[in-house]
């Protein structure tokens, strides 16, 4: 990423006399400081060469302009200090240490009278963090094409120039050339001339001008004139084959193109006392068109692409594409059969459809360029931006070994080849092979820039000594691990976790068990804020130290935080909305996530090793949305069918059956004694322990203790425990309880198991389903009250026949089940009232 707080440079089209120079990859515009609060916006696209220079160049107080990287060096091998004008230069990118200059004159302490920069080394005395956003640039000796717009499919440059991609690549990598502006339009039909195939290209020119005699000079030693032929045995030999004196010329055995490459040749041999120079001889076989072409400029490489893009008029080209589209539509309408609905010529229709697709692609590219106010020649780079050094650092390990970013090596290759190209260009015209070597060096520079931007996308892949491909700029910003998706669009932070799920039978439907270690990482920012707010930690570092040491106060703060927040549980694959739901976290000491078994159907999860991810909604808006839309009690029905999703099954149904089972019923009738004596009981801490069988005497003591605890009204007609119960052998062997709470307490204390029979006082307003059989016994007192005794209940009524006291015979498991149902219903209605 690049940052800017300078105005955008003027467009290249505004001044055609200036050197056309590149654009960049990603550019960031920052509003000026004097305009008020700092605001930044991000725009991805092309930038002009002037814009890149504005990003990188700075004017020092002494008037010197810095920002251009000239040397391919990074740091000195002995002092480990950045080299001047190199890739880590402190003059360009800022000091490594805040307030320290490179020469050592200033060492962090500055007076009010001190200058803002060092007079000796030119380093600005500012903070070192500027090395994260200050850029540099490389002035390329020859323009190079941006590989993103050349190699991607579809190729933007190929569509704009309406040339095959193969021809464009040949021109970019100096495999062919084009004629200069003076005659480009004249030879447009010839296309690009491939280097190494001049004979074929010139043959096309000569053929068009009907100069058939060229065949007498190329590809053979035999020269045919009229109907006679001779063989040239030497480099220069006189031809006297019945020709007139005015037509006799001196012919060399050299190839025609090698002779044509020399502009002036001296006379070689005397023929009938006439001096005939080679140049005159060649003109007999070459037309004036070749002479015109020979005098024009030959363009190749990125500069040729740039010149062609400059000549593009996007508006006119868009109009031309629209006309072509209308023409194709007319052709399509003429080919259509109204009856059969088929084309007359299927091959021609396929060509039309292919041409339509090309027009659509080209139109989209041109409209995007016009809308973004981007000039097409910016796709050719002549100024290459250099990323800030802290984004491509050199790190020293403990052993003293230095490791560097791959970008530094790729930048060095670009600088080395750019320097070599500038040397060969300075020798061009003075050395024989300077033109050829400069052309090869242009292609080498193009490949180096391709590797920097997208290694492997160009013609070759750059590798290190271990045959490992260098990581280019594209590799650093694309994909899941790239700068955009990982650091800008979404940052990878500790707001999510993953673990195995296990069943949590003691959890409520809206709860999930969250491991304490995982919760400590998930809610760490909230814990830090709470510690600082409550003045339990003075600063951020102290709060992190407390969390790292896991001090006891941390768990108390964490417990308070999780009470008011929901977490999201997600199980892949998330095929529908029930695949991710919100739960209230409950801290547990295990390392697995506890999940209520009723919500497993929505997740399509089971407890055979499945894993689930935990996410924390950060903002209050996200918390509210999770509580309203994603909370597990709000997702009991399937959004597809409307049927219930949270339905008990498997072990839940079996548990309900066992919980409401009477010990003397069914197959358990013969096992009641042994099962009750060694049954599993719930304790106060939700642990399970084995209870031992109590003797009859302890049972009687327990009944008496319950009688004393209940405090019955003695000698009252409304006594809670009638005297006849003690005299009836069918009743006194089972304990009597006043309400649910007494039963639950006895279960937790281990006095009852789930299958223990008991008498429970029943509210009069709830009906009792008595046995179909009649009462076992009737009892009356002096006041007229009656007691009806059944095999599973007894009811006490007044003289008017209204019942005012009821007791039912049930089990502890049924009491526990009924109490849980009533509690859930009450909690639901209380939440609705809120």
Swiss-Prot record:
Q: Single GO cellular component annotation? A: mitochondrion
What segments bear the compositional bias annotation Polar residues?
A: 1-22
The answer, when asked if Cell membrane is one of the entry's keywords, is: no
Query: What is the annotated localization of this protein?
Result: Plastid, Chloroplast
Q: Specify where the region named Disordered lies, as residue ranges.
A: 1-45
Coiled-coil residue windows? none
Query: What is the protein's quaternary organization?
Result: In plastids the minimal PEP RNA polymerase catalytic core is composed of four subunits: alpha, beta, beta', and beta''. When a (nuclear-encoded) sigma factor is associated with the core the holoenzyme is formed, which can initiate transcription.
Name of the protein described by the UniProt record: DNA-directed RNA polymerase subunit beta'
Question: Its gene?
Answer: rpoC1
């Amino acid at each position: 990423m690049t940052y800017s707080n300078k105005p955008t440079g003027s467009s290249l089209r505004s001044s055609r006399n200036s050197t056309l120079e590149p654009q960049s990859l990603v550019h960031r515009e920052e509003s000026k400081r004097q305009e008020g609060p700092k605001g930044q916006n991000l725009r991805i696209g092309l930038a002009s060469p002037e814009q890149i220079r504005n990003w990188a160049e700075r004017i020092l107080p002494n008037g010197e302009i810095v920002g251009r990287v000239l040397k391919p060096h990074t740091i000195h091998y002995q002092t480990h200090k950045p080299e001047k004008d190199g890739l880590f230069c402190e003059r360009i990118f800022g000091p490594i240490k805040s307030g320290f200059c490179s020469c050592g004159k200033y060492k962090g302490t500055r007076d009010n009278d001190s200058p803002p920069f060092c007079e000796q080394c030119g380093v600005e005395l500012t903070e070192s963090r500027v090395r994260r956003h200050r850029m540099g640039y490389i002035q390329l000796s020859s323009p190079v094409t941006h590989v993103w717009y050349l190699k991607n499919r579809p190729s933007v440059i190929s569509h704009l120039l309406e040339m095959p991609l193969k021809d464009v690549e040949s021109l970019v990598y100096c495999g062919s050339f084009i004629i200069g502006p003076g005659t480009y339009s004249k030879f447009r039909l010839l296309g690009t001339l491939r280097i190494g195939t001049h004979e074929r290209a010139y043959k096309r020119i000569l053929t068009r001008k009907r100069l058939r005699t060229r065949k007498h000079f190329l590809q053979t030693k035999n020269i045919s004139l009229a109907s006679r032929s001779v063989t040239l045995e030497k480099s220069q030999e006189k031809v006297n084959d019945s020709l007139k004196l005015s037509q006799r010329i001196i012919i060399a055995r050299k190839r025609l193109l090698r002779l044509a490459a020399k502009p002036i040749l001296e006379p070689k041999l005397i023929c009938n006392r006439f001096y005939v120079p080679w140049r005159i001889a060649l003109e007999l076989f070459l037309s004036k068109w070749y002479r015109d072409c020979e005098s024009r400029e030959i363009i190749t490489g990125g500069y040729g692409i740039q010149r062609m893009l400059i000549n593009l008029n996007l508006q006119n080209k868009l109009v031309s594409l629209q006309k072509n589209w209308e023409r194709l539509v007319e052709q399509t309408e003429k080919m259509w059969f109204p009856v059969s609905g088929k084309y007359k010529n299927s091959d021609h229709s396929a060509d039309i459809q292919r041409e339509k697709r090309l027009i659509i692609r080209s139109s989209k590219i041109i409209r995007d360029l016009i809308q973004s106010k981007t000039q097409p020649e910016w796709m050719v780079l002549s100024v290459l931006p250099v990323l800030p050094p802290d984004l491509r650092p050199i790190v020293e390990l403990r052993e003293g070994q230095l490791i560097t970013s791959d970008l530094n090596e790729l930048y060095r290759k670009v600088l080395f080849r750019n320097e070599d190209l500038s040397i060969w260009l300075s020798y061009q015209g003075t050395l024989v092979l300077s033109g050829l070597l400069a052309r090869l060096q242009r292609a080498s520079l193009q490949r180096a820039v391709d590797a920097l931007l997208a290694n492997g996308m160009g013609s070759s892949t750059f590798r290190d000594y271990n045959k490992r491909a260098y990581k280019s700029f594209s590799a650093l910003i694309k994909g899941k691990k790239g700068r955009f998706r990982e650091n800008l669009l979404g940052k990878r932070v500790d707001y999510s976790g993953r673990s195995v799920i296990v069943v949590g039978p003691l959890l409520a439907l809206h709860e999930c068990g969250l491991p304490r270690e995982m919760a400590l990482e998930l809610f760490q920012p909230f814990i830090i804020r709470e510690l600082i707010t409550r003045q339990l930690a003075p600063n951020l570092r102290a709060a992190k130290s407390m969390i790292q040491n896991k001090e006891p106060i941390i768990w108390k703060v964490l417990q308070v935080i999780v009470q008011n927040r929901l977490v999201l549980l997600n199980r892949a694959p998330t095929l529908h909305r029930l695949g991710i739901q919100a739960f209230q976290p409950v801290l547990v000491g295990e390392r697995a996530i506890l999940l209520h078994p009723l919500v497993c159907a929505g997740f399509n999860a089971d407890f055979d090793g499945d894993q689930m991810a935990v996410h924390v909604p950060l903002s209050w808006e996200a918390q509210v949305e999770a509580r309203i839309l994603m909370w597990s009690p709000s997702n009991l029905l399937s959004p597809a069918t409307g049927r219930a999703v949270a339905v008990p099954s498997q072990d839940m149904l079996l548990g309900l059956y066992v919980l409401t089972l009477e010990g003397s019923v069914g197959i358990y009738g013969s096992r009641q004694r042994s099962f009750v004596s060694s049954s599993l009981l719930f304790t106060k801490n939700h642990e399970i322990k084995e209870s031992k069988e109590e003797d009859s005497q302890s049972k009687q003591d327990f009944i008496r203790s319950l009688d004393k605890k209940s405090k019955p009204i003695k000698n009252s007609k409304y006594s809670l425990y009638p005297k006849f119960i003690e005299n009836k052998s069918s009743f006194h062997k089972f304990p009597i309880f006043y309400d649910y709470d007494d039963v639950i307490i006895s279960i937790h204390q281990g006095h009852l198991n789930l299958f223990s029979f008991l008498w429970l006082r029943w509210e009069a307003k709830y009906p009792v389903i008595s046995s179909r059989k009649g009462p076992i016994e009737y009892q009356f007192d002096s006041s007229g009250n009656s007691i009806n005794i059944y095999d599973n209940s007894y009811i006490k009524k007044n003289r008017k026949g209204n019942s005012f006291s009821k007791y039912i015979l049930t089990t502890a498991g049924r009491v526990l089940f009924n109490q849980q149902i009533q509690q859930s219903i009450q909690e639901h209605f209380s939440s609705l009232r809120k």
